[in-house]
Amino acid sequence: MPMVSLVIFSKKDCTVSLKFAHNTCMTNSDKLNEIFQMQQALNLKIGVDTAHMTDEQRQQWVLNYCRAMTQEIAELTDSVPWKWWAKYQKFDKQNARVEVIDLLHFLISIAQVLEMTSEDFYAAYAKKHQVNLDRQATGYQTKDENDSRHI
């Protein structure tokens, strides 16, 4: 990886110095893109090529990843003292953080199976976020199946 030379500057969450590789300065969308690239590389290493799946394979892998996420949610749940009858439990914040990242691995994989890029993912998130804000602003009294169709 090329090193930055003779350029030193700093702005919020973006610092470049002679000691760091060029990619230490990223926008948030660059970070999301890098996460997508990292996940794609990991999936390929595991033998899952999301770019060349049939529709039937895509359906199967969405189910596979959903099942994996179900297990990761159970592991996240076990990081939190949820057994009200058991006094010995402790909150394992470190493990909870790890489980959240495991969930993200599978969530990004599902997005890739569905042929979403990091840009698609961000755009859909932003649109859905606005739908949620609008629902809250209007009291969210009824479920409108059509308010998310544009996403």
PLM feature segments, named:
Residues 5-8, 12-151:
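Flexible "arm" and connector segments at domain edges
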Residues 1-3:
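Methionine residue identity
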